[in-house]
Amino acid sequence: MTTWTQPDPSYTAAGQALARAARPDYFVWLEHVKAAAGCTRPIRLSGLLSTVDATTGRLLNDRHTDGLPDAAIFKACGNRRATVCPSCAQTYQRDAYQLLRAGLVGGKGVPTTVATHPAVFVTLTAPSFGTVHNRIVRKHSCADRRRCDCRAEPCHPRRDTGTCRHEQPAACWARHETGDPLLGQPLCLDCYDHTHQAVFNLFAPELWHRTKQAAERSLRKLCRRRGIPFHPAMSATGKVTYKAPVRLSPGKVAEMQRRGAVHFHAIARLDGVNPDDPADLITPPARIGIDDLIVAFAQAATDIAFTSPAHPDRREGWHIGWGEQVDIRPITMTGNDEVTDAMVAGYLAKYATKSTEATGHTSSRITADTVDDFADPAGDHIARLIDACWHLGRATHIPTPLTGRPVPYPDPGDRLTPFGTPWTCQDCGTRTRYAACPVCVAERQASLDTKPANTSKPHPYTRLRRWAHMLGFGGHFLTKARRYSTTFGALRAARIAYRRHEHNAPTHAYPQAPTSAEHLEPDTTLLIGTLTFAGVGWHTHGDALLANTAAALARARQQAGHEEIAHELGSTITGTQPVAA
């Protein structure tokens, strides 16, 4: 008869948490990891922390991270994907909201006058690559679209319920619910063009770039037709060029549909151009308005299309263009119309933490060792998309091995010496018996050594293997014009400065904790860290449990505070405004 032995408490997360909390330096450790407390996999840094006089450069103090709790400095990973780190993803999402909204109403270094500039909300979708199951609601009666329970229309009704060439049903009469796993799946996997969709995802950023350029060209031509003067500008070579009086400042985000095709939501703001200060954001001319901006983008979305480069599987390339569903709406700053600044910023920031979760596929970068786990030419929809990316991204040119190359042999009677009749080089005057002048060859080779040996551009389809885990899309989630708004780096720097200045007096100070330069007198000392990567993650599951719990409680208090402030503001506004009879 076997007896059960209770495991050591240190082997469980709860036991490790209790052991950590029982230490006398528990609150010191909790304060030390506060900056990365909510992170799932924080980065640990170790090394030397030196305090240096800023004026003389004299070393004042040296401290090693071995004297800190856990002998390391913890830094949040900063990953934007919610499936990887929910805490860092929430921070990224809030930064994205502030960045996008600042480009519409000002703030964060952007003048508030941009609120008077014309702006539109543009949605550009991918074309059809085959019939998929979808959910269409003609008229919503729900209060919240995120919890929509409205009755949907039949998926794909047809008068003649036939089959496709692969003997699959060509109609679907089901009324799909919101969480139906069939949504986004093709009616026939063999009829669906997975290859074309993978190529579209790859070239979608280039298509957006050309669409934006076409809209800008359309606005410039409109300015010429209406007689709006262009601004002369002097180039670096002394040539006078004329700049358009208007400029587009867009910001776009990418969203992955359930079928695995990427489409874009964009904010496009129209700015004027100050010839004396190109970085200045001024109001555009009055003769160019919101209607002209809508027409320019609508025309560009219709006209712009191109053919992808040739591929061995398709010499003529693939057609890259937008789908039929193009939506362009004006944005208002009053908060009373259909599309407002807060709605747009919140809608776009919602996708800040998304990747390919909508398709049901989440994975890290796929390699040759792991591709068989995800790609299958006869598998489901996502497996076929990944297989198409991997197949198209293969090496299309394999050089002949050295052992298989022909070796030229001299004919009988040929001289086997490199020397010939003496001759004089006409370029440098060198007298030589070599077939080529050694002086000129050395100079020419020296100039060639500064250039890459292979000047040919890599095949664009090779990027499909790198981004196979993203179903071919290799662009960033959020891109913007330089003058649209602030940057993520500026928002992070402001947050770090706030934490250091406002929270520089912890309740339980560690006696050997380093003090950064912002905590001292200005312009007196600097804190220089010579740090190296020590690892990723918490030391124990108990540490992760304690740190994440403390961070979750702090976020809950913060959220409750935000809701209370919003409630008080709403009550104040309601109390001051007259109620309609």
Regions found by a protein language model. Name each.
Residues 71-117, 127-169:
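Long, contiguous juxta-domain segments that are non-catalytic but functionally important
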Residues 266-313:
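Helical (often loop-to-helix) elements that flank the catalytic cores of nucleotide-handling enzymes
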Residues 85, 122, 239-276, 348:
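Histidine-centered divalent-metal-coordination microenvironment in nucleic-acid enzymes
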Residues 1-84, 90-93, 318, 322-581:
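Long, low-complexity, charged/polar intrinsically disordered accessory regions
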